[in-house]
């Protein structure tokens, strides 16, 4: 398999774009390879500029629930473009998509659209602070909530600590109001509330996707809800990644825990840049122009993105059973790969939620970021590069989640399992 054209394109891009990419994970640094430059996507497949074709388990990092170039979404976008790209004024499509999402989430009575998941989370936290008149936020080590300054915080030793910036360019003053807790450890959250009497909100990925796939325990989420209620803090579920993938009705429908605010992204835009945050009407009433908490965006709710999102979410609501079908395929995939790994003496931990899947080369189950960090990154990098050569495109980082789309068939799943067995055999014979 030749990737000469990708090598050339990457070299050129590095002279023009920092690191050659517009989002760091795309650089393949975690797996030690060269990023593939993509020419097109169709259904379950990506084709690179060298003509190599891959079954795509990344799906643009989650948005493409129906695969590449879904006919109904593509048609909706083309029709919308005919009427204009952006107006900077309200359109009916915004209300239509809002009503659709509200009908699918019990916790959402009103919703505001933005252009990215980062914006959604940033705005949700500002809203929580404005609603509670408190400043501090609690987040969890290993949970990613976008790249806004207050959320780029390193972990401490595992106990809850006041945060320090994890990126140059983020002043310590910006993160001093961010407290860190350990995922799936309620005692660490209690310590945060003990350390601060000014907590506005606790933000969590109920199904974490950026330390690999690590779902929160239901009992942990229940206790988190109780802690927030007891301390007058809001509970935010960041479902930018898991929203509409783990369940049609959100993580609240499978955990039994209802958040105060939900953030959404990825699938809600059908492949176009859309984010959103929603809550009960009482909380959303604090948002401008109805209330004093300011939030705005030139391209928020733009008609093309709304058309794509409306087509995607309408199709999902009309075919809600597909989540269980995709979960069956995701489960078959990781169980098949786990069995193949076991045959060659390789330990693999697996999990799925809806159309999301994850695996770790680890002896023990993964419950938090520290567990994830104990996984074999070198083995993952080798597995990734060899699976690429077999024609299967997995996320280029151990700490990312995989995705199944409706375009990926049972036959493709079986082919992937067979390829993984071949790769594991090669790895153990190295």
Curated annotation (Swiss-Prot):
PROSITE patterns: AA_TRANSFER_CLASS_3. It is found in: Cytoplasm. Its cofactor is pyridoxal 5'-phosphate. Its EC number is 5.4.3.8. Transmembrane segments: none annotated. It catalyses: (S)-4-amino-5-oxopentanoate = 5-aminolevulinate. Gene3D superfamilies: Aspartate Aminotransferase, domain 1, Type I PLP-dependent aspartate aminotransferase-like (Major domain). One of its GO terms (biological process) is protoporphyrinogen IX biosynthetic process. The modification N6-(pyridoxal phosphate)lysine is found at residue 266. It comes from the Bacteria. Keywords: Cytoplasm, Isomerase, Porphyrin biosynthesis, Pyridoxal phosphate. It is an enzyme of class 5 (isomerase). GO terms for molecular function: glutamate-1-semialdehyde 2,1-aminomutase activity; pyridoxal phosphate binding; transaminase activity. Disulfide bonds: none annotated. Belongs to the class-III pyridoxal-phosphate-dependent aminotransferase family. HemL subfamily. This is Glutamate-1-semialdehyde 2,1-aminomutase. The lineage of its organism: Bacteria, Pseudomonadati, Campylobacterota, Epsilonproteobacteria, Campylobacterales. The gene is hemL.
């Amino acid at each position: 398999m030749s990737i000469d054209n990708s090598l050339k394109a990457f070299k050129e891009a590095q002279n023009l774009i920092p690191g050659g990419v517009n989002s760091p994970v795309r650089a393949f640094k975690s797996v030690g390879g060269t990023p593939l430059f993509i020419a097109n996507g169709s259904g379950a497949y990506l084709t690179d500029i060298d003509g190599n074709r891959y079954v795509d388990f990344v799906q643009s990092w989650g948005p493409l629930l129906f695969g590449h170039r879904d006919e109904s979404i593509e048609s909706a976008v083309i029709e919308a473009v005919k009427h204009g790209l952006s107006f900077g004024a309200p359109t009916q499509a915004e209300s239509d998509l809002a009503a659709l999402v509200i009908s699918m989430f019990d916790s959402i009575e009103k919703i505001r659209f933005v252009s990215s998941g980062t914006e959604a989370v940033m705005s949700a936290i500002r809203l929580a602070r404005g609603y509670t008149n408190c400043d501090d936020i609690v987040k969890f080590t290993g949970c990613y909530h976008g790249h806004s300054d207050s959320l780029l915080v390193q972990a401490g030793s595992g106990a809850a600590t006041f945060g320090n910036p994890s990126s140059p360019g983020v002043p310590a003053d910006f993160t001093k109001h961010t407290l860190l807790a350990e995922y799936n450890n309620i005692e660490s959250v209690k310590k945060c509330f003990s350390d601060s009497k000014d907590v506005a909100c606790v933000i969590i990925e109920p199904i974490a996707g950026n330390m690999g796939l690590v779902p929160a325990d239901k009992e942990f989420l229940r206790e988190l809800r109780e802690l927030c209620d007891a301390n007058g803090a809001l509970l935010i579920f960041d479902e930018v990644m898991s929203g509409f993938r783990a369940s049609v009705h959100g993580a609240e429908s499978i955990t039994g825990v209802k958040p105060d605010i939900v953030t959404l992204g990825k699938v809600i835009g059908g492949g176009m840049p859309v984010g959103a945050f929603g809550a009960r009407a009482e909380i959303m009433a604090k948002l401008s122009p109805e209330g004093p908490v300011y939030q705005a965006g030139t391209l928020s709710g733009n008609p093309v993105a709304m058309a794509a999102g409306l087509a995607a979410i309408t199709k999902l609501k009309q075919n809600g059973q597909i989540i269980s079908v995709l979960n069956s395929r995701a489960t078959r995939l990781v169980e098949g790969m786990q069995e193949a790994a076991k045959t060659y003496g390789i330990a693999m931990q697996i999990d799925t939620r809806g159309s999301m899947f994850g695996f770790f080369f680890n002896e023990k189950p993964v419950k938090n970021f520290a567990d994830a960090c104990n996984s074999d990154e070198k083995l993952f990098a080798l597995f990734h590069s060899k699976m690429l050569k077999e024609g299967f495109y997995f996320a280029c980082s151990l700490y990312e989640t995989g995705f199944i789309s409706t375009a990926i068939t049972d036959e493709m799943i079986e082919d992937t399992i067979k390829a993984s067995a071949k790769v594991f055999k090669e790895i153990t014979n190295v």
